[in-house]
UniProtKB/Swiss-Prot annotation:
Disulfide bonds join 423-457, 427-462. Glycans are attached at residue 426. A lipid is attached at residue 462 (GPI-anchor amidated cysteine). Residues 72-122, 363-403 are annotated as: Disordered. It comes from Plasmodium brasilianum. It is found in: Cell membrane; Cytoplasm. Residues 371-390 have a biased composition (Basic and acidic residues). Residues 103-114 have a biased composition (Acidic residues). Residues 411-463 form the TSP type-1 domain. The keyword Repeat applies. It holds the Pfam family TSP_1. This is Circumsporozoite protein. It is a lipid-anchor; GPI-anchor.
Amino acid sequence: MKKLSVLAISSFLIVDFLFPGYHHNSNSTKSRNLSELCYNNVDTKLFNELEVRYSTNQDHFYNYNKTIRLLNENNNEKDGNVTNERKKKPTKAVENKLKQPPGDDDDAGNDEGNDAGNDAGNAAGNAAGNAAGNAAGNAAGNAAGNAAGNAAGNAAGNAAGNDAGNAAGNAAGNAAGNAAGNAAGNAAGNAAGNAAGNAAGNAAGNDAGNAAGNAAGNAAGNAAGNAAGNAAGNDAGNAAGNAAGNAAGNAAGNAAGNAAGNAAGNAAGNAAGNAAGNDAGNAAGNAAGNAAGNAAGNAAGNAAGNAAGNAAGNAAGNAAGNAAGNAAGNAAGNAAGNAAGNAAGNAAGNAAGNAAGNAAGNAAGNAAGNEKAKNKDNKVDANTNKKDNQEENNDSSNGPSEEHIKNYLESIRNSITEEWSPCSVTCGSGIRARRKVDAKNKKPAELVLSDLETEICSLDKCSSIFNVVSNSLGIVLVLVLILFH
């Protein structure tokens, strides 16, 4: 019986020595991936993420990097490389019950707060940004728009302006042109008109001149003829002789008398006759002559006159015409020009305006969002207090420290296999690890973080004291049985 007792106690001690955690509660149903727990001093951020890297000097097995997830994802992500025996049932996700400091929720609260804050901030920011952006955008847009608008506007404006300007310019130009044209036209017209007028005037003048000439000629002829005829005929036959003598005498006397009398009479008669005849003749002659002369004269005169007249007339006409034309042209041109100019101007202006507006808007929005998140956390905390104390291992103070994790993984570097290692602690929360299937042939020195699977393991009952007491009692019993056998 004593030998059986010694054998039983010895077996118990040997098993306990070889498998120190076999009688402990190593159930990992409450295990969690390290990336889901908080382990820093202020309980507000995730535990610093670890990256396992190979170091040439073998002094450090782990390197810490905040840009890589802690330790590793669970092996379900690579089901294609894992056998059915290695697949495990996904652990139930445990909600993080850590209390968060008020106003420091960066998730739901900030999302809702930012949405509300951005709306208010953007409204104020855009108002200021658009004002500055439109000012710069309109300046550039109008410059391009006016160019196209004025081109179309000036075309229509100049057309109307030139019409009004030419009317006034032509009036002044024609006056100067006609003066020069009439001078040349009258010269040619008078030549033709005088020729026709003199013909008619001489005819009328000769009739009047001959009448006056004959009167004087007859008086002189009769005086000489009468003297000779009277002397011979007076005595005997003044009565009969005078009749025959006068006829012959008058004929000869009139011929000589008329020749001398007509010369003087015609000169005086023509002068008066021509004056009256020229007036009537010139009127008819000038009409025909001026028509032909003015056509050539006006052509040359108008060219010079219009040039000067149009310059002054167009200036006044274009001013009024351009005003109306530019208004319509600029409206269309500015619309297209402003669209492009405002786009660039508003982009720069809104950027600056939104930055300032969002800062103020987000501050107010985040305050409301964080208050809502705080209330939500308080409700979660209230529910947590009603749960069993077994979930206290979620507290960061109960989780393994960074130094503990580093030291444990370093200690099992050479012995880690594809099976789960023992929990790193015998009381509280620790970690355990194993190799992934695709890293089973790697040397220990070549292992990196991506080659390992890790998870949190927790023991509901601490057994440190029990181990000491039970081992001590076992040794005492063995010694007693041996000594008093």
